[in-house]
Amino acid sequence: MTQKRTLLAVGVAVLMFGSACAGGPSSRPDVAVEQNSPGTPDETTTDSAQDIPELQTPVDDLAWADCTQSTLDAYGLTPGTPGLVFDCADFESPVDASGEMFGSFSVGVMRARLGSTPSEAPPLVLTSGADRSSIATLADIAAGPSGTLLGANPVVAIDRRGIGRSTAVDCVKPDTRETLRGLGQFASSGNDVVDRAVDVGRDATIECTDLLQPQELAFATSYAADDLNQLRMAWGVDALGVIGTGNGASTALAYAARYPEHLARLVLDSPTGIGVDQMTLAEQKTQGREAAFAAFVLRCRALRCSLGDAPQDAVADLMGRATAGTLAPLSSHEVVDAIAYALSSSAGDASRRALDLSDTLSSARSGDVSELRQLASRAAAAYGTDGQFVARCTDGQQWPSPQSVRDAGATWAERYPIFGTDAAMTALTCASWPTAPAAPLPSSLSIPVLSLSGSGDPMVGNGGFAAVTGLVASTGTRSAAMTWQGSGHPVVGGSVCAQTAVAAYAVDAALPPDGSACPA
């Protein structure tokens, strides 16, 4: 163990055991009604019979400090809306709200607002869970067409424990982390690619559980919900308005289950599927990535991009080279994540994003992989931290066996030519992680719920959307589902139409017509 790793490990141990201390964004806010669910009003209404709490401004606010430029620089972004302001802060949250485990974490938060945002406007809280640092997610949203959302209410991103600005988890040894980043593609073992992915996942699991035990499961979704409630208490407000994107929607649902009396608004944006095994979730994510890539191909052709008349064939050729190892040390998994990272973003102009990605991939095909390496590094920083590994493995239920991945491999490679093989392999890395209880889900909800889904979502896909909206419907509350016909993640990042609906919902819980569709 290096001196740096030892010091970081000691730091985590003290905190744990010490005393408690992209497809194009739309500028069109038009809404088309496609269908209505049975029993759901077909017009925007509020339900006076429901006792819906109001959003509140914090009574005791956090010690915010301006972090606008440092945040933009950290993620290579430029403001998408004039007057954009980022403020950063931290607060302490106990490792275990029940008191069974001692210690505390520092939880990082960031507030995004405009200079014109009313000072009395109550904040909405955003969590993207383990998908990516919530602060990074909010920064990307704010660098896009965010004026409609941020002009109405400030949005506060809360990083999940172990991720982003929150107390970092540093538990995987550098050599293991490098191998994990490539899913073992360049490991010296003579095993096949499936066994190599299992091996590196097991090594990372042993290293992290050895360091973090007996609190290795204190990074689950339910604990993230407790951190949300700790923010509520720090603010001195009765209830929160929560936007959960992707995996963060699971955190939002867990908060609704654990603290139903402290929830004022609930937006489920591109939620991860519930009640299914990890191979099903992996396939849903792959379907979303393929849909987002198809949208990129169409835009690329329309722009006469550098990938030529057949962008999909050109990228498939590049992926073949990566799989064969000719882009080493860049692995095929890193290339896949780099492409997905670019497709997810809503920052800046959609056409410019498409041209930039095309140029990066074209250069790599011509032998210059420098830009692709930079993109892969940004993707690894966004998706591949130790904290995310721990959180994702803790969240997961029903991880696949190596044989089930082998069985799916050929079918997925044919069905999903760009992303299929990688998705099946990625599902193996957490197979050795200790099983944690499933995240709690609400059986009743006393407030209306707004759910959003994108047609081309490269983060989670939309295959699990019906299950989530079905869960919400089963609670008996009013709800509305909106579909964005664009691509990217989350929906509020790319769709002004969806932002308009969220801003209106924040005021008095008014819902748009169920089944509404926002244009690409």
Over which residues does each language-model region extend?
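N-terminal export and membrane-targeting signals
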Residues: 1-13, 240-241, 439
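Short, charged low-complexity linear segments at domain edges
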Residues: 3, 42-44, 183-184, 366-375, ...
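C-terminal motif of bacterial Sec signal peptides marking the signal peptidase cleavage site
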Residues: 16-20
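Bacterial signal peptide processing site
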Residues: 22-25
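Post-signal peptide N-terminal segment of mature Sec-exported envelope proteins
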Residues: 30-55
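Gly/Pro-rich cap/lid or specificity-loop segments adjacent to the active site
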Residues: 50-333, 390-391, 396-520
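Alpha/beta-hydrolase-fold enzymes
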Residues: 297-390
